[in-house]
Amino acid sequence: MNFTSNQLRDFSTLFSRSEVNRWLKGDFNSIDIKLERYNLIEKNKGNSYLKFLRNTYHILEKNYPNEYVLKNEFLNKWLKKELGTNNSAIFNEFRIGKAIADLAMFNGISKVFEIKTILDKEYRLSNQIQEYRKIFNEVYIIVPDVLLTKYSNYDESIGIITFDSNSKNFKIVQRAKRNKELNPETLMEVLHTKEYLEITEEYYE
Protein backbone atom coordinates (compact mmCIF):
# COMPACT_ATOMS: atom_id res chain seq x y z
CA MET A 1 0.00 0.00 0.00
CA ASN A 2 1.33 3.45 -0.94
CA PHE A 3 1.08 6.37 1.46
CA THR A 4 1.34 10.10 0.78
CA SER A 5 3.74 12.28 2.76
CA ASN A 6 0.76 13.78 4.60
CA GLN A 7 -0.44 10.33 5.63
CA LEU A 8 3.02 9.36 6.84
CA ARG A 9 3.29 12.60 8.79
CA ASP A 10 -0.10 11.89 10.32
CA PHE A 11 0.96 8.37 11.31
CA SER A 12 4.14 9.73 12.90
CA THR A 13 2.09 11.73 15.41
CA LEU A 14 1.05 8.44 17.00
CA PHE A 15 4.52 8.12 18.50
CA SER A 16 4.73 11.42 20.35
CA ARG A 17 5.18 11.45 24.12
CA SER A 18 1.64 12.72 24.69
CA GLU A 19 0.17 9.87 22.63
CA VAL A 20 2.20 7.25 24.47
CA ASN A 21 0.91 8.67 27.76
CA ARG A 22 -2.64 8.30 26.45
CA TRP A 23 -2.03 4.64 25.58
CA LEU A 24 -0.81 4.00 29.12
CA LYS A 25 -4.13 5.38 30.35
CA GLY A 26 -6.06 3.10 27.99
CA ASP A 27 -6.98 5.89 25.57
CA PHE A 28 -6.61 4.67 21.96
CA ASN A 29 -8.95 7.18 20.35
CA SER A 30 -6.24 8.67 18.12
CA ILE A 31 -5.54 5.22 16.66
CA ASP A 32 -9.24 4.67 15.98
CA ILE A 33 -9.40 8.03 14.19
CA LYS A 34 -6.54 7.10 11.86
CA LEU A 35 -7.96 3.64 11.18
CA GLU A 36 -11.20 5.28 10.08
CA ARG A 37 -9.53 8.18 8.25
CA TYR A 38 -7.52 5.87 5.98
CA ASN A 39 -10.11 3.09 5.63
CA LEU A 40 -7.95 0.63 7.55
CA ILE A 41 -10.59 -0.76 9.91
CA GLU A 42 -11.44 -3.81 7.79
CA LYS A 43 -7.78 -4.52 7.02
CA ASN A 44 -6.91 -4.50 10.73
CA LYS A 45 -9.98 -6.38 11.90
CA GLY A 46 -8.93 -8.85 14.59
CA ASN A 47 -5.57 -7.17 15.13
CA SER A 48 -4.60 -5.61 18.43
CA TYR A 49 -3.62 -1.97 18.77
CA LEU A 50 -0.08 -3.14 19.49
CA LYS A 51 0.12 -4.99 16.17
CA PHE A 52 -1.20 -1.95 14.31
CA LEU A 53 1.41 0.26 16.01
CA ARG A 54 4.19 -2.19 15.13
CA ASN A 55 3.10 -2.27 11.50
CA THR A 56 2.85 1.52 11.43
CA TYR A 57 6.32 1.85 12.93
CA HIS A 58 7.77 -0.37 10.19
CA ILE A 59 6.03 1.74 7.54
CA LEU A 60 7.56 4.90 9.01
CA GLU A 61 10.94 3.25 9.35
CA LYS A 62 11.01 2.53 5.62
CA ASN A 63 9.32 5.63 4.27
CA TYR A 64 9.42 8.55 6.70
CA PRO A 65 12.55 9.62 8.63
CA ASN A 66 10.76 11.12 11.61
CA GLU A 67 12.43 11.74 14.97
CA TYR A 68 10.84 8.77 16.74
CA VAL A 69 12.33 6.28 14.29
CA LEU A 70 15.69 8.04 14.35
CA LYS A 71 15.79 8.06 18.14
CA ASN A 72 15.17 4.33 18.30
CA GLU A 73 17.88 3.50 15.78
CA PHE A 74 20.27 6.00 17.34
CA LEU A 75 19.69 4.81 20.90
CA ASN A 76 19.51 1.09 20.30
CA LYS A 77 22.36 0.63 17.87
CA TRP A 78 24.79 3.50 18.12
CA LEU A 79 24.74 6.12 20.89
CA LYS A 80 25.97 4.19 23.91
CA LYS A 81 28.51 2.26 21.88
CA GLU A 82 30.12 5.33 20.31
CA LEU A 83 29.68 8.13 22.84
CA GLY A 84 28.68 6.53 26.11
CA THR A 85 28.78 3.39 28.21
CA ASN A 86 26.28 0.75 29.26
CA ASN A 87 25.79 2.74 32.46
CA SER A 88 25.05 6.05 30.74
CA ALA A 89 21.83 7.73 31.84
CA ILE A 90 19.77 8.85 28.82
CA PHE A 91 16.71 11.10 28.90
CA ASN A 92 14.27 11.59 26.05
CA GLU A 93 12.72 15.02 25.34
CA PHE A 94 14.76 16.79 28.01
CA ARG A 95 13.45 20.29 28.77
CA ILE A 96 15.90 23.18 29.15
CA GLY A 97 14.17 26.53 29.59
CA LYS A 98 12.02 27.08 26.51
CA ALA A 99 13.82 24.38 24.52
CA ILE A 100 13.29 20.61 24.52
CA ALA A 101 16.29 18.51 23.57
CA ASP A 102 15.62 15.28 21.69
CA LEU A 103 18.10 13.31 23.82
CA ALA A 104 20.37 14.03 26.78
CA MET A 105 23.07 11.70 28.06
CA PHE A 106 24.98 11.77 31.34
CA ASN A 107 28.04 9.61 31.97
CA GLY A 108 30.47 11.90 33.73
CA ILE A 109 30.31 14.23 30.72
CA SER A 110 26.91 15.64 29.85
CA LYS A 111 25.93 15.49 26.17
CA VAL A 112 22.84 16.73 24.36
CA PHE A 113 21.57 15.68 20.93
CA GLU A 114 19.27 17.63 18.64
CA ILE A 115 17.82 15.78 15.63
CA LYS A 116 17.18 17.66 12.40
CA THR A 117 15.53 15.55 9.71
CA ILE A 118 15.26 16.60 6.09
CA LEU A 119 11.77 17.86 6.94
CA ASP A 120 12.89 20.20 9.74
CA LYS A 121 13.68 23.89 9.56
CA GLU A 122 16.75 25.35 11.26
CA TYR A 123 15.31 28.67 12.40
CA ARG A 124 15.12 27.59 16.07
CA LEU A 125 18.50 25.89 16.20
CA SER A 126 20.51 28.92 17.31
CA ASN A 127 18.29 29.51 20.35
CA GLN A 128 18.24 25.81 21.17
CA ILE A 129 22.03 25.59 21.16
CA GLN A 130 22.26 28.66 23.38
CA GLU A 131 19.99 26.99 25.94
CA TYR A 132 21.82 23.67 25.76
CA ARG A 133 25.20 25.25 26.45
CA LYS A 134 23.97 26.37 29.86
CA ILE A 135 24.00 22.84 31.26
CA PHE A 136 25.74 20.50 28.80
CA ASN A 137 29.44 19.88 28.27
CA GLU A 138 28.94 18.79 24.67
CA VAL A 139 26.27 19.71 22.11
CA TYR A 140 25.61 17.54 19.04
CA ILE A 141 23.26 17.91 16.10
CA ILE A 142 22.17 14.85 14.12
CA VAL A 143 21.47 15.63 10.46
CA PRO A 144 20.89 13.78 7.15
CA ASP A 145 24.16 13.22 5.28
CA VAL A 146 22.69 15.04 2.27
CA LEU A 147 22.44 18.20 4.41
CA LEU A 148 25.95 18.03 5.85
CA THR A 149 27.17 21.01 3.82
CA LYS A 150 24.30 23.11 5.12
CA TYR A 151 25.18 22.46 8.77
CA SER A 152 28.96 21.93 8.59
CA ASN A 153 29.77 25.62 9.06
CA TYR A 154 26.92 26.37 11.42
CA ASP A 155 28.98 26.45 14.62
CA GLU A 156 32.46 24.98 14.96
CA SER A 157 31.97 24.20 18.66
CA ILE A 158 29.07 21.80 18.20
CA GLY A 159 29.45 18.18 17.16
CA ILE A 160 27.86 16.87 13.99
CA ILE A 161 26.55 13.34 13.49
CA THR A 162 25.14 12.33 10.11
CA PHE A 163 22.74 9.55 9.17
CA ASP A 164 21.98 8.01 5.78
CA SER A 165 18.69 7.88 3.91
CA ASN A 166 17.72 4.61 5.61
CA SER A 167 18.25 6.12 9.08
CA LYS A 168 20.47 3.15 9.89
CA ASN A 169 24.07 4.31 9.68
CA PHE A 170 25.37 7.11 11.87
CA LYS A 171 28.77 8.77 11.63
CA ILE A 172 30.58 11.37 13.73
CA VAL A 173 31.71 14.02 11.27
CA GLN A 174 32.77 16.58 13.86
CA ARG A 175 33.27 16.06 17.58
CA ALA A 176 31.87 18.65 19.95
CA LYS A 177 34.25 20.96 21.76
CA ARG A 178 34.09 20.57 25.53
CA ASN A 179 32.18 23.33 27.32
CA LYS A 180 33.15 23.80 30.97
CA GLU A 181 31.29 27.05 31.61
CA LEU A 182 27.99 25.61 32.82
CA ASN A 183 25.20 27.47 34.59
CA PRO A 184 24.50 25.72 37.93
CA GLU A 185 21.26 27.65 38.51
CA THR A 186 19.84 26.52 35.17
CA LEU A 187 20.96 22.96 35.88
CA MET A 188 19.04 22.90 39.16
CA GLU A 189 15.97 24.38 37.49
CA VAL A 190 15.66 21.86 34.68
CA LEU A 191 16.41 18.67 36.57
CA HIS A 192 13.81 17.08 38.79
CA THR A 193 15.14 16.48 42.28
CA LYS A 194 15.13 12.69 41.91
CA GLU A 195 16.90 12.83 38.54
CA TYR A 196 19.47 15.28 39.85
CA LEU A 197 20.28 13.11 42.86
CA GLU A 198 20.56 9.96 40.76
CA ILE A 199 22.90 11.61 38.26
CA THR A 200 25.13 13.31 40.81
CA GLU A 201 25.39 10.21 43.00
CA GLU A 202 26.14 7.93 40.05
CA TYR A 203 28.53 10.06 38.02
CA TYR A 204 29.86 13.02 39.97
CA GLU A 205 30.73 11.78 43.47
Regions flagged by a language model, labelled:
Residues 1-65:
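Interdomain/boundary linker segments immediately adjacent to catalytic/signaling cores
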Residues 168-205:
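A conserved mid-domain beta-alpha-beta active-site/ligand-binding segment of alpha/beta enzyme cores
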Residues 89-92, 115-121:
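Short, flexible loop segments at the rims of nucleotide/cofactor-binding pockets, characterized by
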Residues 54-62, 78, 179-182, 198:
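Eukaryotic low-complexity, intrinsically disordered regulatory segments enriched in serine, proline
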Residues 103-105, 109-119:
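Conserved catalytic cores of phosphodiester-cleaving nucleases, focusing on short active-site segments
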Residues 107-109, 164-167:
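Short acidic-glycine loop/turn motifs at beta-strand connectors
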Residues 62, 69-107:
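Active-site metal-binding core of divalent-cation-utilizing nuclease and nuclease-like domains
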Residues 119-164:
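Catalytic cores of nucleic-acid endonucleases
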